[in-house]
C-alpha cells in the first residue's frame, strides 16, 4: 500500500528509500514507472550483479549454462547502472575476475596468502579455476581486500576509487537530463531493524541540482496472507539528515507495536492483553508519526489476526487461551533476519527516536 507519489511534472529527481527486502525495488520502481511512463527512470545496483556468473550464484540450477554469462548489457538496457557497495570485502570470485582481466590467469597463491586459501581448498589453483562447477560455490567466500598480497591490494584499492568516481559520474550525467533516480543509500538489507548509515556520495553529488524525495518502507509480516508492504513517498524537507527523516517517515504497523509488547510484556498473556497493550501504545504515539490506517481503524482485528499468524508459524504457542513466545522467530520471506520479533521492535524504537529528533529540529 502506498501513500503519496512523485509529481507528474518533475525534473531531475532522487527517490531515496530504506532497504529491508529484495522485492521492494521492483515494486516501487514499477509503480513509479507506470504512474508516469514518459519520465525516464534510472536505478543502480551492486557491481556484483554485473559480474560473470551472477545468475548462476543466485539460481544454482542454471549454473551449467550461466556460470560464464555476464548480464551487463541487459542491465544497461533496463537503465540499471553499476555502483560498488562492497568497499572492504568482496567475494573471492569478484576479485579474481578483476585481477584476471588485468593480469591473466594468475595462480591464486600470487594474490592471497596460503592461510586464506587453505580453508577453501584452492591451493595450486589459478584464477580461472574458480568458475569450474566443483569450485564455483566456494569461490563466493568473502575475502577482505586487506588480505590481498601487494601489489594487487594497492591495485584493487586504486581501482575501487576510480570505479566509484566513474560510477557516480555516470549517474549524475543521467539524472541531469531530467531522469528520476531510485537509490537505497544503506547499501545492504537491515538485519536487526535498525537502518545502516546512509552513504552520502551519490546523493551529495545529485543534491545541488535534483529534488530529493523519500520513500519510507515498512513491512507488516505478522499480518496474514501476502506480505504487506507499506510505504510513503514524501518530499525531503532538509530539516534533519536523510537517515533520520527516512526512519521517522516509516509507517508504524501492527507487527511493530505487537513485537514491542511480546518482548516487554508478561511471559504469558491472553489475546485481549495484547490488544489492550497495542491500543495503549497507539494512544501514546507522537503526532508526527504515520500509523497504518487499517490498524488505527480496527486495532483489535489487526492484533488478533497477527496473533493467529504467529501461532501458525509457531512463534507463539497457546495453552488454555494464553499465549507465550517461543524461540522460532524467523520469517522465511526474510532469510537475512534471524529474529523478526526483535527486528520489528528495533525498527519501532528507531522510528520513534527519529520522530522525536525531527520534532526538535
Residue locations for each model-derived region?
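Non-catalytic C-terminal accessory region of glycerolipid acyltransferases
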Residues: 90-361
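A short, well-structured juxtamembrane/interface segment
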Residues: 1-12, 170, 174-177
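Generic low-polarity alpha-helical segments
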Residues: 2-6, 43, 74-75, 80-81, ...
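Catalytic micro-motifs at enzyme active sites that drive phosphoryl/nucleotidyl and oxygen chemistry
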Residues: 3-4, 63, 68-71, 170-171, ...
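Broad hydrophobic/π-residue packing in well-ordered secondary structure
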Residues: 2, 22, 42-43, 48-52, ...
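Short coil/turn segments at beta-strand junctions that form active-site/ligand-binding loops
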Residues: 10-13, 39, 177-179, 210
Amino acid at each position: 500500500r502506498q501513500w503519496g507519489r512523485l509529481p507528474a511534472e518533475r525534473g531531475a529527481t532522487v527517490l531515496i528509500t530504506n532497504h529491508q527486502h529484495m522485492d521492494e525495488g521492483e515494486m516501487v520502481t514499477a509503480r513509479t514507472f507506470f504512474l508516469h511512463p514518459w519520465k525516464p527512470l534510472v536505478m543502480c545496483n551492486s557491481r556484483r550483479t554485473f559480474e560473470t556468473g551472477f545468475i548462476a550464484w543466485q539460481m544454482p540450477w542454471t549454473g551449467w549454462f550461466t556460470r560464464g554469462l555476464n548480464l551487463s548489457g541487459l542491465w544497461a538496457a533496463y537503465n540499471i547502472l553499476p555502483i560498488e557497495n562492497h568497499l572492504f570485502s568482496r567475494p573471492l570470485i569478484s576479485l579474481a575476475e578483476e585481477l584476471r582481466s588485468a593480469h591473466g590467469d594468475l595462480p591464486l597463491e600470487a594474490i592471497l596468502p596460503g592461510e586464506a586459501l587453505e580453508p577453501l581448498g584452492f591451493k595450486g589453483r589459478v584464477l580461472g579455476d574458480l568458475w569450474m562447477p566443483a569450485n564455483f560455490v566456494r569461490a563466493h567466500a568473502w575475502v577482505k581486500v586487506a588480505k590481498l598480497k601487494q601489489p594487487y591490494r594497492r591495485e584493487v584499492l586504486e581501482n575501487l576509487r576510480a570505479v566509484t568516481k566513474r560510477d557516480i559520474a555516470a549517474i549524475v550525467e543521467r539524472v541531469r537530463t531530467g531522469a528520476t533516480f531510485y537509490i537505497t543509500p544503506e547499501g545492504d538489507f537491515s538485519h536487526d531493524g535498525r537502518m545502516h548509515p546512509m552513504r552520502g556520495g551519490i546523493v551529495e553529488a545529485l543534491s545541488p541540482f535534483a529534488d530529493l524525495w523519500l520513500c519510507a518502507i515498512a513491512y507488516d509480516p505478522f499480518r496474514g496472507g501476502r506480505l504487506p508492504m507499506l510505504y510513503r513517498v514524501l518530499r525531503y524537507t532538509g530539516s534533519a539528515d536523510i537517515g533520520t527523516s527516512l526512519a521517522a517517515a516509516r509507517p508504524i504497523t501492527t507487527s511493530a507495536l505487537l513485537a514491542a509488547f511480546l518482548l516487554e510484556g508478561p511471559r504469558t498473556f491472553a489475546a485481549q492483553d495484547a490488544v489492550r497493550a497495542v491500543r495503549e501504545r497507539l494512544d501514546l504515539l507522537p503526532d508526527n508519526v504515520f500509523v497504518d490506517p487499517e490498524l488505527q481503524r480496527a486495532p483489535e482485528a489487526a492484533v488478533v489476526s497477527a496473533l493467529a499468524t504467529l501461532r501458525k508459524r509457531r512463534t507463539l504457542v497457546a495453552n488454555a487461551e494464553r499465549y507465550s513466545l517461543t524461540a522460532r522467530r524467523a520469517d522465511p520471506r526474510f532469510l537475512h533476519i534471524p529474529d523478526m520479533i526483535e527486528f520489528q521492535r528495533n525498527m519501532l524504537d528507531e522510528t520513534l527516536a527519529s520522530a522525536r529528533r525531527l520534532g526538535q529540529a
